[in-house]
Amino acid sequence: AIHSDSYQYQMTYLKTEDKLKGDFKKFIVNNLSKLYSIESDNSMMEFEINNTNDKNAIVCYSSKKSDIDQDYQTLIDSGLQPRYNTSIPKLLQNIYNYYNLEKNDGYSLLIYIDQFKTHIVLIQKNQLLESRYFHIGLNYFINRLSKLGSGTLPTEEVRSTVFHFLENYGISKTKNKFELQDGFPYDDARLMLNELSSIMMNQMKDSINNFSTIQPVIGKNDFAFGGVYIGGPGSHIKNMDRLIRDTIGDPVENLNSITTTSFKKRLDSKMNFRTRVKENYILYNKKRSKNNLKNVQNKIQ
C-alpha cells in the first residue's frame, strides 16, 4: 500500500437510511458533490457500510486522482506493483486487523504521529468508527527546536542534532547527561519540548473527547480503552508513549514493535522449518547409508 500527504485524502462519516443502501454509491457521490464540491470523474473514492455505528457510511475520498494515477504508473514502470492507496485511518485499520490487535469488545485507539499531522482513529470489533486529526506532527517539534541552535550551527547540522535529541533524550522532566555538539542548548531544548508536547497532549485530549461515538472519556476512572497503539515518525520521540499513557490513562503499545516482532516470528518460523527439513534430510541419508552398508556387508558374507 502507498500513501502520500499530497493526495489529500479525507475521511467523512455519514448517516444513511436502510432504504438508501441499495443505491449507496449514488447517495455518496451526490452528498460529496454538495458538501465538498467533489467531481466524481476526477476523484478517488472508497466507502463501506458499518452497521455497528450510527454514522454507518464510512467514506474515504481524494480529489487528486490524476496525481495518484501518475504515481501508480511511475511505480509500475519502475518494476513495482502497488496493491492500493488510501488514507492513514484506513491503513491503520488494515494494520489493526492484519495483526489481530482486537483484545475485547471495547474501543481501541490508534494514534499515528506523521510529519505534519497526528491522526487519531477509533476502532471497535475491527470496524472503523471515527477518525480525527490535528496539525501537530514530528516537524512541529523539529522546526521549533532547530531555532535554538540556528545561530551557532549550520542548518542541516542543527536538524541532525535535533533528531538525535528527540530520539535519544526526548521528553523528560529531569535533566540527563547530554552528549551532543557544542552550541546546542540542551536545557532550553528540554524545557521547550516539554512545553510543545503539553500543547500536543491538550489537542489530543480535545480530539478524543470530540468523538461523537463515545462520551468525553479522558480523566474518567470508569472508562478504559480496549487497546491504545501509537505509530508513525513522531512515535520515535523518546518517552512519547509514556506521555500519551499518562494523558489517556491506559497502557500504550508501539505499532513498530508489534510489526517488527511479528516479522521476526515469521522469519524464525521459516528458519525453523528449513532447519527441520535439513535435519530430516540428513537423518534420512544417514539411515539410507546404514542400510546400503548393511546390504553390502550381507553380500560380502
Residue ranges, per PLM feature:
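Phosphate-binding glycine-rich/basic clefts of nucleotide- and phosphate-handling proteins
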Residues: 124-219, 223-227, 232
